[in-house]
């Protein structure tokens, strides 16, 4: 019999520690000016075609064999279970003439593959997800069917949160502003935005966001996913065409489907394929009538969180102008984290924001808040305020969240604590480049561009993914592992999320343990063609040499293939 109390996630009270220690746990102090890097604008220069490293054939073969063995064992377990343990498989069996909730085929991956490693996903945490994060300890005695919680926690170095600029803090100017807003406005504004839910704080924060991204106006949403999922149907219909990058986020896909627009996809970041597709669609027109499309909109992301790659914005703007299309850029992961002043991909490439028709972003990641925004010309935003369902029926962004957004924006621009925003931007730029180049030199395969704060490191075999996650947790390091269907079947990976809250010494500690675990799991399979090689040989640098030389080398673009 399962005890309810043993499976309930416990409520852990805040730690009673000195204030200075608390601040240090949430945001590490800079130990040297050498550990800063000023990101540079590319002045309209396009990205080169990426050079992707690939493992030897035997690595791919072993990965496929891993899946084959798991699938065979899973089917054997299903046969034995459905034959001898029917009471444990009621959800996939017919009961009293009712069809099963799930078929054995559609639920196979979840039951027989994912459940084996469920302890690596959705780990509950408590407290502020800053430089360190408190993970609730849990155990399972029945292959992750359920977990029990002993009531203890582990303080782990945080490489798992989208806390890019380190604004996830319980002390400081942002927290003070949020508390003051709560005292003045409360936690709820009383109704949807078009009824009585708009306060002066909403208007002011939308103005700040628009000014920050370089647009005339902006509209805020209380949920990032809902921003994309709800706004496409305001200006698209079945006579419009959306040309979408194949790796666009599911929120974009959901929104486009709800709009009823036709959709065509092009290979990720392949500008030749995109241009060919645009030309074909202009010639062919609508599928049945072959009349010209009412409008064609190209949808891309600024920074792709599973790949660490960036949209080739200069080429996209060139194609948009050449073929008279609209351009939509989702800056969920790039706004605040990329560019010399943190203004995203336009800032990174040195391209005027006026060249982007519609800009979307989330406020959860770089700003430590919640929700999303759409920024565009004022007449477009005015139309969205009338047409979208969210302002009429959805809940507005709470006042404390608005205060967090406004104060973090003011910190980045220097209106509050001049110099602090630039330090945060320079710290995340250095940390991202240092960790990426160090991993390459150690012999790991990593994807993405040099300045990306998201660093995917390939693990390949499904058995190595939970092993890596568990071994890092034992070393008090919290990481996120990702597998199919979020990635290709044989390209499971760990995704390191770099933060300005981390110190150089934190990354040294991380590298030492990654190096140790990588040797034990045989993860060093890089050929060196994507970077990190030494004297033309596959990179297998000594960890001491990496820590000694890489902090200086990572500031030199010649060490990166960009």
From Swiss-Prot:
Tell me where it resides.
Answer: Membrane
Record's keyword annotation contains NAD: no
Signal sequence, start to end: none
Q: Which UniProt keywords apply?
A: Acyltransferase, Lipid metabolism, Membrane, Pyridoxal phosphate, Sphingolipid metabolism, Transferase, Transmembrane, Transmembrane helix
**N6-(pyridoxal phosphate)lysine modifications at:** 365
Location, primary (coarse class): membrane
What cofactor does its activity depend on?
pyridoxal 5'-phosphate
Q: In which pathway does it act?
A: Lipid metabolism; sphingolipid metabolism
Give the residue spans that cross the bilayer: 61-81
Q: Which Enzyme Commission numbers does its entry carry?
A: 2.3.1.50
Keyword Cell membrane attached: no
The record's GO CC annotations read:
membrane; serine palmitoyltransferase complex
| Catalytic activity annotation | L-serine + hexadecanoyl-CoA + H(+) = 3-oxosphinganine + CO2 + CoA
- What superkingdom does the record give? Eukaryota
What is the topology of this protein in the membrane according to its UniProt annotation?
Single-pass membrane protein
Can you provide one Gene Ontology molecular function annotated for this UniProt record?
pyridoxal phosphate binding
Its GO biological process terms? ceramide biosynthetic process; sphingosine biosynthetic process
- Which PANTHER family does the record cross-reference, listed alphabetically? CLASS II AMINOTRANSFERASE/8-AMINO-7-OXONONANOATE SYNTHASE, LD36009P
Q: Which family does it belong to?
A: Belongs to the class-II pyridoxal-phosphate-dependent aminotransferase family.
In Swiss-Prot or TrEMBL terms, this protein is called: Serine palmitoyltransferase 2
The taxonomic lineage of its organism, from the top, reads: Eukaryota, Fungi, Dikarya, Ascomycota, Saccharomycotina
